[in-house]
């Protein structure tokens, strides 16, 4: 996923989930935050951030959208739409080794009472396999270990359990955690934050759902799905 034009700024404060105050070229601006999660460990007053410049769109309420933040020397993308886009591109370009011989890939497909991020079809040795992928973006990191979620997510738990049902019905089910940074070498479930979600993922992994974690290469104007990262399911 590539951004058209990106500028730098200094984060000042976040009045609510949707907007932030950022200093850009010496002027304080109200900007859109492309992530409604808490991100408290990232959005600390004074940190450097990157913003997508949207001034060429006259219909926008704000001129900029906050997309990335530096945590020390590590650049973390926090755009909640980016993991889905990066995964879609990587799968389409056959860069995800777990999904090969792709014949069809589609976004936002309904199954049961849920809408999964991606639907795909593969053809191996004449056998057609249909499947769903649910993508979760990961921004919470501590000492090289990433965790999800950073806030309770009933909706996320529902998606995971629906994926188990899809597998029971013969579909291939994949839960893909996209770590929106490069560097961490382990992904863990955040049992302390959301035990129900963590239990659901553990249950899913034991009942046919493929749980994957990939890091990402983060450039100032781009996010590219990277390498597979080990998963620790333990509480």
From Swiss-Prot:
Q: Name one GO molecular function term.
A: DNA binding
Entry coiled-coil feature ranges: none
Pfam families for this protein: SfsA (PF03749), SfsA_N (PF17746)
The record's listing under InterPro entries reads: SfsA, SfsA_C, SfsA_N
Protein family according to the UniProt entry? Belongs to the SfsA family.
Q: What is this protein called?
A: Sugar fermentation stimulation protein homolog
| Species the sequence originates in | Alkaliphilus oremlandii (strain OhILAs)
Gene that this polypeptide is encoded by: sfsA
